[in-house]
């Protein structure tokens, strides 16, 4: 495994650990999710370029489209929660609260 692949795998692991450890605030969770999507995009692009599999060159673009949709939904959810409760805690997303 080359140094570039190890760095990308490490970046994905750090983003995943950040998502698991700092899950109290919605903004930090969204940032970790975006970091994971960015590393998946870079890893997919590098793999496609290394294998010369040009038929799959559209897959990273599709991943970016889904990442943009996820970011838009996440930010709208963040705005809704912060306007309703005044804070961006993930525990405020529980619909079973009274």
UniProtKB/Swiss-Prot annotation:
The chain crosses the membrane at residues 1-21, 29-49, 61-81. Keywords: Electron transport, Membrane, Mitochondrion, Mitochondrion inner membrane, NAD, Respiratory chain, Translocase, Transmembrane, Transmembrane helix, Transport, Ubiquinone. It catalyses: a ubiquinone + NADH + 5 H(+)(in) = a ubiquinol + NAD(+) + 4 H(+)(out). This is NADH-ubiquinone oxidoreductase chain 4L. GO terms for molecular function: NADH dehydrogenase (ubiquinone) activity. Belongs to the complex I subunit 4L family. The gene is MT-ND4L. One of its GO terms (cellular component) is mitochondrial inner membrane. The keyword DNA repair does not apply. The keyword Transmembrane applies. It is an enzyme of class 7 (translocase). Core subunit of respiratory chain NADH dehydrogenase (Complex I) which is composed of 45 different subunits. It comes from the Eukaryota. Pfam families: Oxidored_q2 (PF00420). The lineage of its organism: Eukaryota, Metazoa, Chordata, Craniata, Vertebrata. It is a multi-pass membrane protein. It comes from Sorex unguiculatus (Long-clawed shrew). One of its GO terms (biological process) is ATP synthesis coupled electron transport. It is found in: Mitochondrion inner membrane. Its EC number is 7.1.1.2. Core subunit of the mitochondrial membrane respiratory chain NADH dehydrogenase (Complex I) which catalyzes electron transfer from NADH through the respiratory chain, using ubiquinone as an electron acceptor. Part of the enzyme membrane arm which is embedded in the lipid bilayer and involved in proton translocation.
